[in-house]
Regions:
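RNase H catalytic domain
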Residues: 63-144
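Catalytic phosphate/metal-binding cores of nucleic-acid and nucleotide-processing enzymes, i.e., regions
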Residues: 60
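RNase H-like nuclease fold core
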Residues: 1-57, 68
Length: 145
């Protein structure tokens, strides 16, 4: 079994721009990575919710970008299991809970939920998907979906 490990992070840079960064590794070898500003819709989250909450949105946007990369056949050709590592409560909730658990007014989170689960549905037939919630290097919760 070949496992692809996705690490994702959202952060605001020194200019206050919401950024997302991800890496995908197989057997400790990097196979894909990217760092970029999130799109304009997500940038509104910084203005609406503040930097800390916006970082949670940035993290889930990074997960979305990584899952999009995994749908590329050249990236995932030998992968049959995906392990997604997230640290924020919002990313964990979006990945593991139904959309009904997300507040109706949290439109950014609901949009991300839809995007994530559409991508997971594409990957699920050929891959096992594991979600890990981490704090530093410690795994505090895990779930197979």
């Amino acid at each position: 079994m070949t496992t692809a490990t996705i690490s994702a992070k959202g952060y605001t840079n020194e200019d206050g721009i919401l950024m997302s960064r991800y890496s995908i590794r197989c057997n400790d070898i990097p196979i894909a990575a990217d760092k970029r500003p999130t799109n304009d819709v997500q940038q509104v989250a910084v203005e609406q919710f503040g930097r800390i909450s916006a970082r949670s949105i940035g993290e889930i946007v990074a997960v979305i970008q990584a899952l999009e990369a995994l749908t590329d056949a050249s990236v995932c050709a030998a992968v049959d299991c995906v392990s997604i590592h997230v640290s924020t409560a919002l990313a964990w909730k979006i990945l593991t809970q139904p959309v009904s658990t997300i507040a109706v007014h949290a439109t950014h989170a609901r949009h991300c939920h839809e995007q994530v689960h559409n991508l997971l549905d594409k990957l699920r037939p050929s891959m096992t998907i594991e979600i890990l919630r981490t704090k530093g290097t410690t795994v505090i919760d895990s779930r197979m979906i």
